[in-house]
């Protein structure tokens, strides 16, 4: 069965007696549509029994150099939430989309109320995504498109080891702050053959305080330029 040395931190070890997961998922959704508007709403509840995950690391023998991280079945795991969405499109070239999502996870906890399974950063409870676009054809030979998109995510907390190479130092609660990332992009089409693309990614130059797991992998604002030419359309 599985036995893997994870970069000298610990040995991830499989368990032959694992039970299969059982999941019960319930979803309710509704949609309302008109010629220029579309709205959606949904709620869900997912209950997983015997969820397979990693337990707390431990030393098998006093002389072991690396701790073992075994796979186990969690007694109970629940996640629930909902999403609201709105899409609009007007005849003047403007269109927009907004979505809001709420997510709540419930993991088993120890006697101190700490999550016993923190192999990943917990989901951020609130997430808002925004997308807006304007498109206009100025003539038969020139068309432009402008698009602004962004996401806003709430803060979250996770309990992590102070030193992954020395788990005897214990754990500490780490807060991952809320953040927002935006992108502004524009395309300019000349005739049928030439298209110029320009973009500013991470528009407000956001940099995470620390990079870990699902933190955004960005080191600041990024400028992008692209040019495509379809030779067969000249």
Describe each PLM feature range.
Residues 17-19, 73, 230:
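Generic structural detector for well-ordered beta-strands
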Residues 19-21, 31, 42-44, 75-77, ...:
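Surface-exposed loop and edge beta-strand positions of immunoglobulin-like domains
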Residues 33-35, 91, 139, 191:
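Short strand-coil-strand connectors
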Residues 21-28, 101, 119-234:
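Conserved C-terminal beta-signal and adjacent last beta-strands/turns
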Residues 1-25, 45-69, 154-163, 205-218:
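Surface-exposed extracellular loop regions of Gram-negative outer-membrane beta-barrel proteins
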Residues 1-7, 21, 47, 51, ...:
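Surface-exposed loop/turn and secondary-structure junction residues enriched for glycine/proline
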Residues 15, 25-31, 38-40, 71, ...:
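Membrane-embedded beta-strand positions in outer-membrane beta-barrel channels/transporters
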